Amino acid sequence: MGENASFWESLIYAHPTCVTWKQEAEGSIYHLASILFVVGFMGGSGFSGLLYVFSLLGLGFLCSSVWAWLDVCAADIFSWNFILFAICFVQFIYVTYQVRSVSFDKEFQELYSALFQPLGISLTVYRKIVLCCDAEVITLEKEHCYAMQGKTPIDKLSLLVSGRIRVTVDGEFLHYIFPLQFLDSPEWDSLRPTEEGIFQVTLTAETDCRYVAWRRKKLYLLFAKHRFISRLFSILIGSDIAEKLYALNDRVHVGKGFRYDIRLPNFYHTSLPETPPVPPPRRLQRRSSGRPRPGVPNCSSPRKQ
């Protein structure tokens, strides 16, 4: 203990104390560096915040280097400040390169602005999601099928970007799928990662549609690597299923003017006027809400672009 005490005493008290203080202030370069440090440490998060912090801190260290070289004439102070300036400069270049490299096609940029950006998802996280679907938007032509009842396997998760999808079971209309809604969220949620299944409904394009598709196995690998993305998709899929249940609730009738409420366990029904299905407000573009055209849909495979 005595040796430790003597060490700390020598470290703290061995240096000579300042008897007289300088009356004159340091040069303007020193004060400019201090101001840049204060303002620089007020930066926020994200790419913009990093660029802000590294640029101002780099300028502050550069001013400190100039001050140490011209006024103090201390090689060690100059060396350390110049090294810190070089580190900030390299970090600024690296962040700038990352910002320039994170760019998407128009449809993916619109999808980010409409769905992911309001949730606070950064561009780096969104880039991982886009790369998982190979940055590809698939085209589904009018009256072509995305899935057929009892035939199409459940091997992917798709999100509608534009157009409108009609969902039917045994030829009976259930509900529509609009932009920014998943095409197969109930099927995805009904299966475990190791299970396989087939669609119990038919999904047909009412208009020319564009959608993004993530392969099941590839998406689960992404979830395993990034738990945040897994929680994000869990929230999005749960919200999407809830919207589909509300849309399906409008299709359950007792008689004229009466409807069941499938959200309640006893199927409590209320008297409401019949209204056509209305798309949710969260979508990329507005489409007409006409009824499905008669005829047998052409269920050829969609085109990739």
UniProtKB/Swiss-Prot annotation:
Which lineage is the organism of this entry classified under, starting from the top rank?
Eukaryota, Metazoa, Chordata, Craniata, Vertebrata
Cite the GO molecular-function annotations of the record.
cAMP binding
Glycan attachment positions: 4, 298
Gene for this chain:
POPDC3
Q: How does it sit in the membrane?
A: Multi-pass membrane protein
Keyword presence, Transferase: no
Query: What name is this protein filed under?
Result: Popeye domain-containing protein 3
| Protein purpose | May play a role in the maintenance of heart function mediated, at least in part, through cAMP-binding. May play a role in the regulation of KCNK2-mediated current amplitude.
Q: Tell me which UniProt keywords the record has, alphabetically.
A: cAMP, cAMP-binding, Glycoprotein, Membrane, Nucleotide-binding, Transmembrane, Transmembrane helix
Q: Where in the cell is it found?
A: Membrane
